[in-house]
Each structure stands twice: as structure tokens, then as C-alpha cells.
């Protein structure tokens, strides 16, 4: 492994991302594909880049990311969380700025389970008076 590599694990919904930061030119590889190929949606790409843009390090690191589980937005959120943790491993003084933006906290919201007798988690069957 490289001598100056920084690692961060990120999670969101049912997605988990492993992020490896290496000094470089700003290349982002997700599951052996580029950011543009992996995320078709512009919003997902923006979410991934948010912590790097905040601390002005977009072109300072190359990133190698593996992400599993969940959907597009969950995976993007997990990657953002992992990048944030890796940046904090690189430089702990960035923590305050990243926390203020809300990237350090793991978003604990999960899908609510479906209950017996209901159609979804909270949606009740239609009530008929007669």
C-alpha cells in the first residue's frame, strides 16, 4: 500500500462506502468506474464533491472508492461520509468546518419497517363507514 494514503468508511441508509484518498490530481474512481459513468445524476455527483469543494481540495487527491448496497442517493451519501472521514484522517483541523456543513454526522434515518395490518409502514387500508 502507499505510504501516504488516507481511509474513511461512510454509511447512509443501507449503503456502505470505503474511501481511499491518495495525493494526486483529483481523479475519482468508484467501483472501477469514473464518477461520471457511475453516477448518471448530476445531483449525486454534486453530493460526492461537496466535502472536497468545502475545503478546496478537489484537485489535491485521487480517490479510489468501493461502495455496496442501497440506491443512488444512499450510495452518494455514503461516499460523502467516507470522504469526510478520510479528510479528517488527513487533517484533523478540517473537522470543525466539515461538522458545521453537516458532513461529519452519520445520517441515522433508515427505512421504517412495514407493519402487519397496514399497507406500508404507516399507510392504513381505506376505511369504509358502511
Swiss-Prot record:
GO terms for molecular function: RNA binding; structural constituent of ribosome. It comes from the Bacteria. Keywords: Ribonucleoprotein, Ribosomal protein. InterPro entries: Ribosomal_Su5_D2-typ_SF, Ribosomal_uS9, Ribosomal_uS9_bac/plastid, Ribosomal_uS9_CS, Ribsml_uS5_D2-typ_fold_subgr. GO terms for biological process: translation. GO terms for cellular component: cytosolic small ribosomal subunit. Belongs to the universal ribosomal protein uS9 family. This is Small ribosomal subunit protein uS9.
Amino acid at each position: 500500500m502507499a505510504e501516504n494514503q488516507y481511509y474513511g468508511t461512510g454509511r447512509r441508509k443501507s449503503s456502505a462506502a470505503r474511501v481511499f484518498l491518495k495525493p494526486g490530481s483529483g481523479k475519482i474512481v468508484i467501483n472501477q468506474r469514473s464518477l461520471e459513468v457511475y453516477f448518471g445524476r448530476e445531483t449525486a455527483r454534486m453530493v460526492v464533491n461537496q466535502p472536497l469543494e468545502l475545503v478546496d481540495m478537489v484537485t489535491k487527491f485521487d480517490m479510489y472508492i468501493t461502495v455496496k448496497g442501497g440506491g443512488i442517493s444512499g450510495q452518494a451519501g455514503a461516499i460523502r461520509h467516507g470522504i469526510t472521514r478520510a479528510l479528517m484522517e488527513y487533517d484533523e483541523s478540517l473537522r470543525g468546518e466539515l461538522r458545521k456543513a453537516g458532513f461529519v454526522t452519520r445520517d441515522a434515518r433508515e427505512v421504517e419497517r412495514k407493519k402487519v395490518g397496514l399497507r406500508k409502514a404507516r399507510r392504513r387500508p381505506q376505511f369504509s363507514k358502511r
